[in-house]
Amino acid sequence: MEDRIALTNIKKKLHGQLALLSEQYQVKSLGMFGSYVRHEQSTSSDLDLLVAFNEMPGLLKFIELENYLTDLLGIKVDLVMQENLKPRIGKRILREVVPV
């Protein structure tokens, strides 16, 4: 039950930032996947986020976004660009992803 509450709270925080993320970082869509979605996270787990961009950011802007989300949520965030998904693992991730 606590896992579901944590996931819901994370989703609410992220959803509340979508306009800012779109404006400042050109984020088109954001979704969660991985251990948090499967309710298998531990205290050392990071939060896996799948991101698609309207305009591809440079490396520094990408890292800035990852750090911003980590600070916002208080959880280490691992950003994965949807555009860079490998076919085999990409299918699994896309089946699991929970849109924000």
Tell where the protein language model's regions lie, with residue ranges.
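Catalytic metal-binding acidic patch
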Residues: 34, 39-58
